[in-house]
Amino acid sequence: MAHTKVAIIGSGPAGYSAAVYTARALLAPTVFTGPESGGQLMYTTEVENFAGFAEGIQGPELMFAMRAQSERFGAVMRDELVTAVDFSQRPFKIWTELPDGTPYELYKMGKPEELHEVMTTLRKTEPQWTADAVVLSTGASSIMLGVPGEKELLSKGVSTCAVCDAAFFKEKTVFVVGGGDSAMEDATALSKFAKSVTILHRRDSFKASKIMQERVLANPKIKVLWNTQVLEILGAEKVEKIKINENGVEKELPAEGVFMAIGHKPTTQVFADQVQLDGHDYLVTRQSATKIGLDAAQAALTEEGLIAYPTMTSVEGVFAAGDNVDVRYKQAITAAGQGCSAALDVERWLERQ
């Protein structure tokens, strides 16, 4: 069993920024990046809205640079999946192994009850790590359809971030899958660049807010196909067609881009019974933009009227940053800022222990 003063669970902009700041504070953080380090930006081609890169930067390149920067200051990277935690007492316990015969896929597609059973089994064994403080920066992942061609053509015309990639689809034919606010926002953003935007929605009405629906339906560049399901995304090296079922009729349509906008799911299942989550499985901190977060903030006010350790979760010594907390913005640069904030909170909290 090994010990680290600060454990950062998850990589991406939030985790790597937290690593840079805690490492510079001489806290020698250990970053558990998981086997797929770098987060959602590893699937993003050009990043043009991250301040400091006048010509833009490739998503993977940005993540590699942030990782190298944190390592330069002394952060230790562990490309391991955190399989269970115990935050009931300090030092906190962290497991990075799976019971014999348990597949890694359980942590990506397994049922909550199955995952809970595995974690309960692990907590009866000796952990691989302990930590004095923990930063949770596991992010969130876009919910995907699971249709053929989707995974193979990701970053080759299939995207989960219209804000990030819209400019690369200038004068192209694109489709947006979804019917909520995210789909409306994506379609509107894409309409500024694309030749045509078609929203594919499986129902006969949107669930988005009325004002966002009105904007979309009034936009001459946006078309809606109701009662439509995506069956397959076709293409060799890039998206070429999309196969759909519209009102019971199957057809193939030419396509150059397909944007998934059916929601995001925070990666918090490993912490579900250890820290407080909101109704949508996002981690609750003292600065969360939710009623639960406001209540937590009110209870943590200092004599000066400030929130003590805004990034702290419901467990003292456990902090959170990035898209597993952020219910609103979900941008790389805001995640990086939250990672910085969490690191500073960790440093100040440890000084007082």
Placement of each model-derived feature along the sequence:
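Phosphate-coordination loops involved in phosphoryl transfer and adenosine-cofactor binding
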Residues: 3-5, 79-80, 170-172, 227, ...
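Beta1-alpha1 glycine-rich phosphate/pyrophosphate-binding loop at the start
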Residues: 4-73, 178, 182-210, 225, ...
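Redox-cofactor binding/interface segments in oxidoreductases and associated redox assembly factors
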Residues: 9, 136-137, 176, 260
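Short amphipathic alpha-helical segments
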Residues: 19-20, 43, 146-149, 187-189, ...
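A Rossmann-like FAD-binding core segment of flavoenzymes
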Residues: 67-120, 129-131, 191-305, 348-352
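A structural signal for the hydrophobic beta-strands that form the central parallel beta-sheet
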Residues: 77, 136, 160, 224-226, ...
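FAD-site-proximal beta/loop scaffold in flavoenzymes
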Residues: 141, 146, 152-168, 262-329
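A conserved FAD-binding loop/helix module that cradles the flavin
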Residues: 184-186, 304, 309-310, 315, ...
